[in-house]
Regions:
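N-terminal secretory signal peptides that target proteins for export/translocation
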Residues: 1-6
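Bacterial N-terminal signal peptides
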Residues: 9-22
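Conserved RNA-binding domains used in RNP assembly and mRNA/RNA metabolism
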Residues: 23-119
């Protein structure tokens, strides 16, 4: 491959990469709303302890130090927040559907707000 062709491929790749990084809503670190079931990071989508309701399991795991999580389809996001109002809402919505607005980085959502999903 000639040097000119290598340069052309490199420039095209750089332009495409830069363009994709600035597409609104696609950039890493952008705020979005996730809808899913409130759980905990220890159990995720599976609460298998016999004799305990899933909502009670979520609360027990969080009380033992686990973080809240949001199950969205097959994906489990760990929820990160120190806001007491958000934590209280997550506790109230244990094992229920919720809308969580925040910034996702990998498998963690930095929570900005939590609301119930109207039934």
């Amino acid at each position: 491959m000639s040097r000119l062709r290598i340069l052309q491929v490199w420039v095209a790749t750089a332009v495409l990469s830069t363009g994709l990084a600035v597409v609104p809503g696609m950039a890493a670190g952008s705020t979005r709303t996730f809808t899913g079931k409130v759980s905990d990071a220890m159990c995720g989508a599976k609460h298998t302890e016999a004799g305990i309701a899933p909502a009670d399991c979520v609360r027990a795991c969080v009380q033992k130090g686990a973080k809240y999580a949001l199950v969205v389809g097959d994906k489990v996001y760990t929820l990160s927040t120190s806001d007491q109002a958000a934590l209280d809402t997550l506790n109230k919505l244990a094992w229920e559907q919720a809308k969580v607005t925040g910034t996702a980085t990998g498998d963690t959502i930095a929570v900005k707000s939590v609301t119930s999903v109207a039934k």
